[in-house]
A protein has these predicted regions:
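Rossmann-like dinucleotide-binding cores of NAD(P)H-dependent redox enzymes
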Residues: 211-250, 321-367
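Flavin-dependent oxidoreductase catalytic cores
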Residues: 1-192, 196, 201-204, 212
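A conserved short coil-to-beta-strand element within the FAD-binding core of flavoproteins
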Residues: 254-264, 277, 363-374
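A conserved FAD-binding loop/helix module that cradles the flavin
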Residues: 318, 342-343, 417-440
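Glycine-rich dinucleotide-binding loop and its adjacent helix/turn
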Residues: 171-183, 256, 260, 274-325, ...
Length: 440
């Protein structure tokens, strides 16, 4: 053990001899893989570091190579686990211990300090999602915190893809030079659709001074109301709730279907945020099918045999939920990859789960027809079949729902945002709505 520590401790001694500022060591309390460093090792290390004059210990978890979801505190990791590691180390040292990881709600810092889990909290991604996070926690700024979803899609994903730092919930990140300017001549604006794009557009328009009315025929949140029902995505409900609460408080919402004639008569500008619809299957004999609405608890079958047509992330996540409800599920997919466009850490968790659940996946295949309870397939040019099928879920993409566009575009200033313009991710919907609202 002493030999393992020697190099690091000698470097530390030299640093302490050279500088007079505090030295903080960040360490992973548990790397969460079989041959990785464990909590007992890191407690011993922390004690040794204190003896060598380290001023504080900053406690994270995971390994960037072996267990990145823990290292980056992905939403699939239970909140507070790393705080517990910090508390274990704190109980063995007298120097300050710093906790980190998913500290993204107003009560989190107070809980960590009050419960004695750590002496200091460190905050990273929540400041990307909401730069005023600290002021709101302290009560100096009295408005709701825009919560980091811990999804890693904009921040880590943006950097990895070469697009630069972004954020799903905060479209201003990376665009700080664009000022949200107040409008000199407010317009009466109707936003049609209360999904993520519609809510973001309405809030930004209102902040700029426009007179905004939002029309929603069902419930605020749109299709995103299904997103957090997928495995390991419960965190997304907080992010949706933030938008719904903000819109409910600040925007005039009319819960009814918008009619083009009334929109043209009563509003100067119309923003369509009507989202998208699932593609309709053209499979002979298939008269009834499901889409992601099957994730709603009262609509999820149990102990049945089902086939999912399409192996993108929506189809794959639905498969996981259905199997966990006792269903025998087969995914039919034309290409070889499952969920190829999914955020990488979420995808790795998903693929691991599908493997553990022994979900049957047939690639290179198409459904040719359905007759009775039998689905007939074409598998690499050969015929196959699945018998005794109780239900079919069709998840082969979405199409924009912009049926009002033609009636409105000739008589009103019209903008399209979100999926009704181009089907994309939650980040695409929010960012396109933000950009549009700045231009009105």
């Amino acid at each position: 053990w002493e030999n393992r520590l020697r190099f690091g401790l000698e470097v530390l001694e030299r640093i302490k001899e050279t500088i007079s500022i505090p030295v903080i060591v960040r360490l992973s309390a548990d790397e969460i893989f079989p041959k990785g460093l464990k909590l007992d090792d890191m407690i011993r290390l922390s004690v040794a570091l204190e003896q060598k004059g380290v001023d504080a210990i900053h406690v994270s978890s995971g390994s960037v190579c072996e267990t990145p979801p823990w290292y980056f505190q992905h939403m699939s990791i239970s909140k507070g686990k790393t705080w517990e590691f910090a508390a274990k180390i704190k109980s063995k040292v007298t120097i300050p211990v710093i906790a980190v990881g998913q500290i993204n709600e107003k009560h989190d810092p107070e809980k960590i300090l009050k419960d004695g889990l750590a002496d200091v909290v460190a905050i990273g991604r929540p400041l990307i999602a909401d730069p005023d996070f600290v002021g709101k926690v302290l009560g100096d700024i009295r408005s709701p915190i825009r919560p980091c979803a811990c999804c890693l899609e904009g921040c880590i994903g943006g950097v990895r893809s070469g697009q630069g730092l972004m954020c799903v919930v905060n479209p201003e990140v990376g665009k700080e030079e664009k000022k949200l300017e107040k409008i000199s001549k407010p317009r009466k604006v109707a936003v049609v659709g209360g999904g993520l794009a519609g809510m973001e557009a309405a809030l930004v328009l209102r902040e700029r001074g426009h007179l905004v009315t939002l029309f929603e025929k069902k419930t605020l949140g749109g299709l995103f109301n299904l997103a957090y029902r997928a495995p390991r995505k419960a965190n997304l409900e907080k992010f949706k709730k933030y938008f719904v609460d903000e819109v409910t408080e600040k925007i005039d919402v009319i819960f009814e279907e918008a009619h083009p004639d009334k929109l043209m008569k009563n509003y100067e500008t119309v923003i369509l945020a009507t989202g998208s619809l699932p593609k309709t299957p053209s499979i002979p004999g298939l008269k009834e099918w499901h889409w992601a609405e099957i994730l709603e608890p009262d609509k999820t079958p149990k102990n049945k045999r089902g086939v999912i047509v399409g192996g993108g992330f929506i189809g794959a996540e639905i498969a996981e939920v259905l199997v966990k409800n006792g269903n025998d599920v087969t995914i039919i997919k034309r290409s070889e990859e499952i969920a190829p466009r999914m955020e990488v850490m979420s995808r790795n968790f998903l693929l691991k789960s599908l493997k553990e659940l022994k979900v049957k996946i047939v690639t290179g295949a198409d459904v040719v027809r359905k007759k009775g309870g039998t689905l007939y397939l074409s598998i690499d040019g050969k015929e196959g079949r699945i018998e005794n099928v109780d239900f079919v879920v069709y998840t082969k993409g979405m199409i924009p729902e912009n049926s009002m566009e033609n009636r409105l575009k000739e008589k009103a200033e019209l903008f399209l945002v979100g999926d009704c313009k181009e089907v994309g991710r939650a980040m695409d919907a929010i960012h396109s709505a933000y950009e549009c609202a700045l231009s009105v």
